[in-house]
Amino acid sequence: MEKIMLAPLAYGLAVVLSLFVVFIGARFLLVPQAAAAGYGVPARPDGDTAYLTVKGLKDLTFGLLGLALIAFTTADAVAWYMLIVALVPLGDTLIVLRNGGTRAVAFGIHFATAVVVLLNAALLFAL
């Protein structure tokens, strides 16, 4: 595939992934209990909500950083970023599995996300 044809796909996917992480972060900040349930490990109603706020802030920051890199750096920089942040959904897969979440959520959401992020890194490195 020619680089000219590949660039919109690679950058488009990077933008979608980054915006999705911004959305997840905002959701954890605004409706933390619902966001935790969607993550695959429901939060205890009497639990410490500070951890959900921390997750929301970190996800929001990761998403905004991704968008900034897309806007102001090279494809290689964005590719390295995607390669590194793929560790997050891989770790999320293990967290869900070790804390009573379903295999469907662990692999269908988190592991699948890691695969898409790694695929995006490969597309960006190819530019």
Residue positions per predicted region:
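N-terminal signal-anchor transmembrane alpha helix
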Residues: A10-L30
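Non-cytosolic membrane-interface motifs at loop->transmembrane helix junctions
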Residues: Y11, A104-A112
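Core segments of alpha-helical transmembrane spans in multipass integral membrane proteins
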Residues: G47-I70, I84-L87, G91
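Small-residue-rich segments of transmembrane alpha-helices in multi-pass membrane proteins
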Residues: I109-L124
